């Protein structure tokens, strides 16, 4: 079991680095899928088969595939993106170092007064499945954080739609109210065109 743990952990670290360092976005998504698969392997080692299945079905089957479709459909200029990244490389490195230092300080301060013990055991009932145990905890003790997380995701979805929704003036569209208000008097126009000159000064709506 420790061999598989270190194997999955090493593969997760390597694939995560490949996600960040890959120049091609399609390769980054493929490495991300590989990361999720190894993460599900860790869940199986911990005995959480339901979480492993959710990680495969939701993250790999929905989110990662959605990323892949979006990247394949978008016409991304990778050379231009790399040029912009090089222009802001110093700022990116500075922000990364600050976040890394913050993470290290947080880990050191949070684990300073922890007493480690290897004689820790958890009572697991044989008549309760993995899914039922997660549901009992999720909808009782963590009901409020679960609802708040759903609300945050809903707000993020609405924000993405608002930011990407643009009004296009060049596209022709129908005005149902104006179409229903038309009648014979404002639709039919009787004219007397001059011979060989055609009809002029007619406004179409």
Curated annotation (Swiss-Prot):
Highest taxon in the source lineage: Bacteria
A GO cellular-component term linked to this record: plasma membrane
Principal subcellular localization: membrane
Catalytic activity: a quinone + NADH + 5 H(+)(in) = a quinol + NAD(+) + 4 H(+)(out)
Example of a GO MF term: NADH dehydrogenase (ubiquinone) activity
Pfam families named among the record's database cross-references: Oxidored_q3
EC number assigned by the record: 7.1.1.-
Cross-referenced InterPro entries: NADH_UbQ/plastoQ_OxRdtase_su6 (IPR001457), Nuo/plastoQ_OxRdtase_6_NuoJ (IPR042106)
Gene3D superfamilies cross-referenced by the UniProt entry: NADH-ubiquinone/plastoquinone oxidoreductase chain 6, subunit NuoJ (1.20.120.1200)
Location of this chain's protein in the cell: Cell membrane
Keywords: Cell membrane, Membrane, NAD, Quinone, Translocase, Transmembrane, Transmembrane helix
Residues spanning the membrane: 1-21, 26-46, 54-74, 89-109, 142-162
Membrane topology: Multi-pass membrane protein
Family statement: Belongs to the complex I subunit 6 family.
Function description: NDH-1 shuttles electrons from NADH, via FMN and iron-sulfur (Fe-S) centers, to quinones in the respiratory chain. Couples the redox reaction to proton translocation (for every two electrons transferred, four hydrogen ions are translocated across the cytoplasmic membrane), and thus conserves the redox energy in a proton gradient.
Protein name: NADH-quinone oxidoreductase subunit J
Source organism per UniProt: Rickettsia prowazekii (strain Madrid E)
